[in-house]
């Protein structure tokens, strides 16, 4: 899923709408559509009905913000999420980590002449994500940009997201006067009931060891696995990382 303003998704006309007031709503609509099509088959495109308690379950794998969206959805009553995988994110993010993430996103190159320049840029800003092969870097570069009108490339990411962050976080996620206390979703976490796996980069500045340990003892009592030598956030492109997720999703254990 490409969240609005990113990847192949459209950019919002009203830039102030970027934020967690919009993202979970979009994701819930997508899940309802997917569940409906799985339930109704070929007729789904002709008959639109809201998802019900009998909707098929869906597994959610989310990195960073995608994990927060998944957590918010999994905390809802009658959530269709069967199993939840959070990649290097938890219900608490310190203000230092938030500031660091904002600065990282602000290191934005407006235009690239070719995909080699895209790769060079990504190898720099994404270095702590972990090692990739040349072929994987080429794949990441190709899917991180779109062609610009002048024949070059631009990041597939609306720069207005950063300017909207200050407004949205203050008004909707309590990053105003409470900013110094960090981003706190512990009540949401404690409402999650589905089996949950958390992958944590051992060098992560976003998901601290203390937060991960608390996640193991509260809410869905997540299974925590550290990915050694990696910061925020593991690529989930290596065979071992993919295998960890596959084994969790295919586990015969019944959901909580």
Give the positions of each predicted feature.
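Short beta-to-alpha linker loops that shape the active-site pocket of alpha/beta-hydrolase fold enzymes
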Residues: 2-6, 90, 228-231
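Active-site loop/oxyanion-hole signature of alpha/beta-hydrolase fold enzymes
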Residues: 3-61, 244
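Conserved catalytic-core motifs of eukaryotic protein kinase domains, centered on the activation segment
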Residues: 9-16, 96-97, 209-210, 237
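Conserved hydrolase catalytic core segment
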Residues: 53-97
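A catalytic-pocket lid/entrance helix-loop region that shapes and gates access to the active site
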Residues: 89-117
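Conserved alpha/beta-hydrolase catalytic His-Asp/Glu region
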Residues: 113-170
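Conserved serine/cysteine hydrolase catalytic core
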Residues: 146-214
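Catalytic histidine-centered segment of alpha/beta-hydrolase-like enzymes
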Residues: 230-239
């Amino acid at each position: 899923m490409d969240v609005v303003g990113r990847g192949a998704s459209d950019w919002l006309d009203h830039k102030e709408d970027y934020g967690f007031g919009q993202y979970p709503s979009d994701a819930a609509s997508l899940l309802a559509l997917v569940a409906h099509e799985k339930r109704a088959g070929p007729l789904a495109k002709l008959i639109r009905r809201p998802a019900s308690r009998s909707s098929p379950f869906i597994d959610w794998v989310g990195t960073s913000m995608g994990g927060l969206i998944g957590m918010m959805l999994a905390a809802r009553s009658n959530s269709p999420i069967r199993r939840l995988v959070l990649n290097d994110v938890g219900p608490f993010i310190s203000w230092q980590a938030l500031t660091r993430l904002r600065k990282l996103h602000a290191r934005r190159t407006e235009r690239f002449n070719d995909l080699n320049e895209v790769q060079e840029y990504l190898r720099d800003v994404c270095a702590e994500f972990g090692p990739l092969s040349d072929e994987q870097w080429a794949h990441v570069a190709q899917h991180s940009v779109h062609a610009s009108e002048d024949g070059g490339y631009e990041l597939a990411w609306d720069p207005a997201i950063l300017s909207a962050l200050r407004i949205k976080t203050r008004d909707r996620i309590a990053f105003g006067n409470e900013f110094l206390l960090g981003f706190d979703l512990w009540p949401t976490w404690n409402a999650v009931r589905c089996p949950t796996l958390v992958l944590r980069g051992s060098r992560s500045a976003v998901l601290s060891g203390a937060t991960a340990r608390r996640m193991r003892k509260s809410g869905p009592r997540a299974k925590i696995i550290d990915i050694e030598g990696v910061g925020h956030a593991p690529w989930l492109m290596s065979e071992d990382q993919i295998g960890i997720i596959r084994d969790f999703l295919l586990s015969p254990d019944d959901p909580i």
